Amino acid sequence: MTPQFRNTVERMYRDTFSYNFNNRPILSRRNTVWLCYEVKTKDPSRPPLDAKIFRGQVYSELKYHPEMRFFHWFSKWRKLHRDQEYEVTWYISWSPCTKCTRNVATFLAEDPKVTLTIFVARLYYFWDQDYQEALRSLCQKRDGPRATMKIMNYDEFQHCWSKFVYSQRELFEPWNNLPKYYMLLHIMLGEILRHSMDPPTFTSNFNNEHWVRGRHETYLCYEVERLHNDTWVLLNQRRGFLCNQAPHKHGFLEGRHAELCFLDVIPFWKLDLHQDYRVTCFTSWSPCFSCAQEMAKFISNKKHVSLCIFAARIYDDQGRCQEGLRTLAEAGAKISIMTYSEFKHCWDTFVYHQGCPFQPWDGLEEHSQALSGRLQAILQNQGN
């Protein structure tokens, strides 16, 4: 049966927004897709030219999907405004399906004066490899304009609440676990799109000098291997990087350490219980006491997963942090200090280096050797 939706609406009810834009990664019975859009010129001083809502059903004919409804409207509207360059922003409850994703890419290729930013509350069929490839084709800028896709964070939810909801001047109240779900989806989208770190971020945060100032973030690069015929085989789709969520970042009041964000995402990989896996992490700081405890619990409960950690620096190697590292090692994790080999591997694998080779900084090997000795003393419970 053809969905009976009006072409556009200007606002939705509060319960409708909270129900359909809930960002829990896996949700059932959310078959209506809501697409809130804004169209602006390239002049940032000018207000949006149009801002409304399309909606459609996930399982209906393609022409009834909200993405296609938008392009049907926009194409006709665009004929009257051919000379202008436009920035289109979508806030959408589900990321576009495979066919819509390909149609979006085609549209943008045919109209280079339009740029599209897509903020999604949830990822649609993120485990499907064909869908992942469609998203990469849409978002990776190889031969022309493409879309930028991001996960909605608190700021985007707040914006939609103010712009597209009958809020009656009530403030947006986030649901439980909104920050955690955001980080999970952010990591998964990064895996799919194969995001890379920019070179200054890597060299600044992974510098292994003994005393560094202003390095308050922890970056964690990871890769996963599966044992096959006594050989470790790299799983390219399970590779990425993340950093800790600092308090108040992206509008979230509470922070979350990088290691805990990483542990949150592993269950969504659905690793086969009958296969053996090796997870390798390259971190700018070794885990704090609490994170080390949680990682130790994880590998103690997941006998088919082994964990290797290479740290650029040792975090607060006094007291409980030392105890945490020992607990983690006793649980079976292999903890080491990054050497030139690991720094180069991270540069080659996780950094958008554009063909530039890794250039070690002064003192890299000396710092690495000193930190390795210090780590061994900690793990062997030797005195300071």
Swiss-Prot record:
The record marks 244 as: Interaction with DNA. It catalyses: a 2'-deoxycytidine in single-stranded DNA + H2O + H(+) = a 2'-deoxyuridine in single-stranded DNA + NH4(+). Its EC number is 3.5.4.38. The active site is at 259 (proton donor). Keywords: Antiviral defense, Cytoplasm, Hydrolase, Immunity, Innate immunity, Metal-binding, Nucleus, Phosphoprotein, Repeat, Zinc. InterPro entries: APOBEC/CMP_deaminase_Zn-bd, APOBEC_Cyt_Deaminase, CMP_dCMP_dom, Cytidine_deaminase-like. Zn(2+) 2 binds at residues 257, 288, 291. One of its GO terms (molecular function) is cytidine deaminase activity. It is an enzyme of class 3 (hydrolase). The modification Phosphothreonine is found at residues 32, 218. Disulfide bonds: none annotated. It is found in: Cytoplasm; Nucleus; Cytoplasm, P-body. Its cofactor is Zn(2+). Its main location: cytoplasm. Zn(2+) 1 binds at residues 65, 97, 100. Pfam families: NAD2. The CMP/dCMP deaminase domain 1 mediates RNA binding, RNA-dependent oligomerization and virion incorporation whereas the CMP/dCMP deaminase domain 2 confers deoxycytidine deaminase activity and substrate sequence specificity. This is DNA dC->dU-editing enzyme APOBEC-3G. The lineage of its organism: Eukaryota, Metazoa, Chordata, Craniata, Vertebrata.
